Amino acid sequence: MVDEILKLKKEKGYIILAHNYQIPELQDIADFVGDSLQLARKAMELSEKKILFLGVDFMAELVKILNPDKKVIVPDKSATCPMANRLTPEIIREYREKFPGAPVVLYVNSTSECKTLADVICTSANAVEVVKRLDSSVVIFGPDRNLGEYVAEKTGKKVITIPENGHCPVHQFNAESIDAVRKKYPDAKVIVHPESPKPVRDKADYVGSTGQMEKIPEKDPSRIFVIGTEIGMIHKLKKKFPDREFVPLEMAVCVNMKKNTLENTLHALQTESFEVILPKEVIEKAKKPILRMFELMG
């Protein structure tokens, strides 16, 4: 099946982009594996006009927004993000009225419709820097409450998180899990995603996005790392650092990320059916806050 996918990909002129949380078999056939922003930026650099995207809907849409002239297809239309879907345009409008003048900073894990109402987009890697560089002591931030609280801690600014209980179910780790792994691996370094709850972040050695997690073993000579994010990241790290050991903090599985399989990836290439289509107006409006992020980050 892998050979068939690679053959069809070449014949039809597709590039395969896969998120870090995809199953190992899909990461291995991808031309590029990364976080949502790395993938969107990669798509902008490509001369190829056809992209098969392996991730969830908001990520595929981000690629389309930044590459409106390219054809973007996905293997499963139902692969979505429950956290992104919790935030609605109505909630954003309501908070804009409550806090006039406060910029709306939306995490990239948000719907395209919501992005059209944002002042700036951020990622888990640059959220702290983006908020720091905004000329405002108060920001409205969504949809991840934990990331918003982390940003508040690091910037000293007032961060109003929306919606009320926005969080990623996959990253709801237990602080006790860190105690347990420290007993089992006393020399290990613990790295957790900023979407984790505060008690977990406070007990970790490092807090970072998946892109940042990849850089830590380059600087830290530890032999064992405990990873607090979706299980797919373990494969990426083991591949990059074969001489180190990577242990999951907990068995954190994103069921939506795992909806993509070798079978439906092959089917996507055969039929080219699930194309990502967005209204022109949404693309134009959602692109502005994304470009603002690039501007702020220099």
From Swiss-Prot:
Its main location: cytoplasm. It is an enzyme of class 2 (transferase). Its EC number is 2.5.1.72. It comes from the Bacteria. One of its GO terms (molecular function) is quinolinate synthetase A activity. GO terms for cellular component: cytosol. Pfam families: NadA. Keywords: 4Fe-4S, Cytoplasm, Iron, Iron-sulfur, Metal-binding, Pyridine nucleotide biosynthesis, Transferase. InterPro entries: NadA (IPR003473), NadA_sf (IPR036094), Quinolinate_synth_type2 (IPR023066). Pathway: Cofactor biosynthesis; NAD(+) biosynthesis; quinolinate from iminoaspartate: step 1/1. It is found in: Cytoplasm. Binds 1 [4Fe-4S] cluster per subunit. Iminosuccinate binds at H19, S36, Y107, V108, N109, S124, H193, P194, E195, T210. This is Quinolinate synthase. Its cofactor is [4Fe-4S] cluster. Catalyzes the condensation of iminoaspartate with dihydroxyacetone phosphate to form quinolinate. Belongs to the quinolinate synthase family. Type 2 subfamily. One of its GO terms (biological process) is 'de novo' NAD biosynthetic process from L-aspartate. PANTHER family: QUINOLINATE SYNTHASE, CHLOROPLASTIC, QUINOLINATE SYNTHETASE A. [4Fe-4S] cluster binds at C81, C168, C254. SUPFAM superfamilies: NadA-like (SSF142754). It catalyses: iminosuccinate + dihydroxyacetone phosphate = quinolinate + phosphate + 2 H2O + H(+).
